[in-house]
Structures are given as structure tokens and as C-alpha cells.
Amino acid sequence: MPLQLPKLIFGATTLGNLFVARSDQEKHDLIAQWFRHSELPVVIDSAGKYGAGLSLQVIGRELQSLGVAASDVIISNKLGWRRVPLRSPEPTFEPGAWIDIDHDAVQDISRDGILRCWQEGNELLGQYRASLLSVHDPDEYLAAAIDSDDRRRRLDDIVAAYQTLADLRDQGEATAIGVGAKDWRTIRELNQYCDFDWVMMANSFTIMNHPQELVLFIDQLASQDVAIINSALMHGGFLTGGDYCDYRPLDPAVAADAKKLKWRSDYFAACRDLDVDPFDVAVAFGLSHPAIRSVALSTSRPDRVEALVASVNRQFPVAVWDALKQRGLIDTDYRITAG
């Protein structure tokens, strides 16, 4: 039986001061709203990379402050980065991304390195433990290879790291191990070497982008009883009107970028005509494949949490999907019965 997770998983990048330094009170209020509007247990997705461990530290501190029982929360910790002293004006690992943090971070992906990351995560979480473990962004780690030999070495590092995670699972230190990546093809490659309980796909299966090849891979994962979490459904805020798509600004002079901008304009117009909310429709599409049980959504605003919870339960009639297909916004070969 696949891992059982709720429809909504809360992303915790904002707790690590992604792009904006939030106050302790704002972070406290945000976490409080997660528990106010959700059924238990609440699932939180974090990583040692988020604010060089700050996100994990805040989670442990605020859960304790709120008196949350360990049985009422499930924490996912994506491993592969650990904190080190900050010896420069700003962090070196993602300059400009993490604001007002007191540590830097280094990558440490290997059989022993992933254990060090796990141990640090436990220390930062205090009395809580992460029960869902994974290697953080293995696609980016592989993409940094300078040649084929280096890529083979990096692949060996990742597989060795997963051997450590499998050992932790066998020892009862973790409930399940998985993988998260922006490039779903990396997940498919690693699936040949690793025994995953769950996968998290980012910027991959969305209303704007849902290639048939990926749909077939999702079918394959379902046949293996692998739980699937869909994330980054809005392409980094692009589908809510942001200037960035998949974390980079778009240039209308570039044909591929112009195509995405036109798609969004047409999508917004269609949603207006159909009197539906573009965000809610995008979330519903992200859950439309029967094998996808959960989506990971993030907000920095406590007053938006209730709307996120409502969005994962909102369904649309087949007529809405048919209308979007007729306008060329959804692949006509992709079948949606409801949702």
C-alpha cells in the first residue's frame, strides 16, 4: 500500500527567510494557522538548505511553543546541505536568496555526508524528528558534473546516500524515503537504483506543462505503489501573475518565453470567461491524475492558509476542462473525468 499522506503538504521555505526576512511572530502565526485549518497530522516539507537550517530550527521551536504533539506532525527533511559558519557578507550557497541568516551552507552528498545532514536536522528540530527523508535536488547535483566521469561519480554519491537512508528506514529512524526534483527525468533515472516510498515532482506536472511521457511515468510509479507529491504547481508564481517562471525572469523577445507568456494570458482570459479562479483550477489540475494524492503549497501569509486548504478540496465540472482543452490550454489527449 502506498504511503498515506493528506492532500495538502505545507512548504516551509519562508521559515528560512527566502527572499524576505520574516519576523518570529509572523512565522509563529503561519505555523499556528497550519494546525488551525488542517486535519491532523499536519505534514511540513523542509530542508537543511532552507536558510542554512533556519527553517528546521524555526519548525522545532514553534511546534514546541504551540504545544504540538509529535504524533500530530509529519516532517519531511530533504537532506544534502548542512550549515557552516558564515564568513562572508552573505551566504555563498545561493546568493541573494536567503535574507538575514546567520550561517552559510555546504553540500554534503555521500553515504556518510547524508548521515551528517540527518543528524544536524535532528539537532535543529529539537524534540521533533523528520520521518520522511530524501536527498535534496539530485537533478541539480548531477547537472553540475563537468564530464561523464564526474556525472558517474555524482550518481554513485546519490545512490550511496540513499543506501544510508534505506538503513535509517530499516532501523525505524524514518517512516519513508523518497526523492524530490525539478527534472522528473532524474527521478526516473534514480528509480532504477533506489527503492522509493514517495516522489515529489516540482515544476513538472502542471496545467501548463504535462507531457505524455511524464504521465506514463506517473502511471509506472503508481504500479509500484509509490506515493506521488506534486509541487511548484504555479511555476514559481508565474501562474499567479509573477514575473518569474521556474525561478527566472522571462524575456518576451525569446520565442520560448513569449509562448509561455501568451499561454498565461490565454489561461487567465479563459478562467475569467468560465468564472473560475486560475489558482484553484491549477491546483485541481495538479491533483487530476488519480495517482497523485498530495500537493505541496506554500504561502508566507498566515491569512492565506485557509484558502490553500480550501483549494485542494475544490472540484470543477468536466465542462471546465473541456473548455480549456478547446482553447488549446490542456493537452487534448490527457483525460480528466472530474476534479
PLM regions and their residue ranges:
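Acidic (Asp/Glu)-rich catalytic clusters
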Residues: 2, 36, 63-70, 125-127, ...
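N-terminal binding-site loop/beta-alpha segment at the start of enzyme catalytic domains
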Residues: 1-90
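Beta/alpha (TIM)-barrel catalytic core signal, keyed to glycine-rich beta->alpha loops juxtaposed to Asp/Glu
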Residues: 26, 119, 123, 130-131, ...
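Short, flexible, mixed-charge acidic loops at enzyme active sites
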Residues: 86-97, 242-247
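An active-site-proximal structural segment forming one wall of the substrate-binding cleft
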Residues: 107-129
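A solvent-exposed, charged loop/short amphipathic helix patch at secondary-structure junctions
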Residues: 94-103, 148-151
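Active-site mouth loops of central-metabolism enzymes
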Residues: 13-25, 99-115
